A protein has these predicted regions:
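Non-catalytic regulatory/interaction regions at protein termini and inter-domain linkers
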Residues: 1-157
């Protein structure tokens, strides 16, 4: 699937539900926001309500909660691609999460690859629905160098 990637070192993650995705990604997102990186979440479904619920229950200071909620958690890819384009032009460091079914991830990655071809300051994290790809997880992991877990980014061995 991602063997044709040319410019980005990619990471994968696997989730069982929207809340699970958010629990896996939030520590990493929080770290990247602390590093002043732009965080963009391209998602097949709207996560606005689930992230609000989760953020209200986690132990973070209010400023960090506000920063997390400022991220666009809705499924409006067109607006997010406009934002990616702006960030590329201004040479911002960014982390892009791509969350959804395997076909969605493949299509979004093809577009991201074209748009960010010459940009070296982009990190992409593909987040797969475990229910959909459970039989193919090993093959998918073979295409990545890292996996994202709640403990952070780990090298796949």
């Amino acid at each position: 699937m991602n063997k044709n990637q040319k410019t980005k070192e990619k990471t994968c993650a696997f989730y069982a539900s929207d809340y699970h995705f958010e629990m896996i990604s939030l520590p990493y997102i929080n770290k990247k926001l602390d590093e002043s990186k732009e965080v963009i979440v391209l998602t097949e479904n709207n996560l606005k309500e689930t992230i609000k619920t989760l953020v209200s229950k986690i132990n973070l200071n209010e400023d960090k909660k506000v920063d997390i909620l400022k991220i666009d958690w809705e499924n409006n890819d067109l607006n997010k691609f406009k934002k990616i384009n702006e960030d590329i032009k201004s040479k911002k460091d960014m982390v892009i999460f791509v969350k959804g079914k395997e076909n969605y991830i493949k299509n979004i990655n093809e577009t991201i690859e074209k748009w960010t071809e010459k940009s070296k300051n982009v990190e992409i994290i593909d987040c797969y629905d475990m229910e959909e790809i459970s039989q193919d997880m090993d093959n998918i992991m073979d295409q990545y160098k890292f996996t994202l877990k709640t403990t952070g980014k780990n090298i796949i061995k």
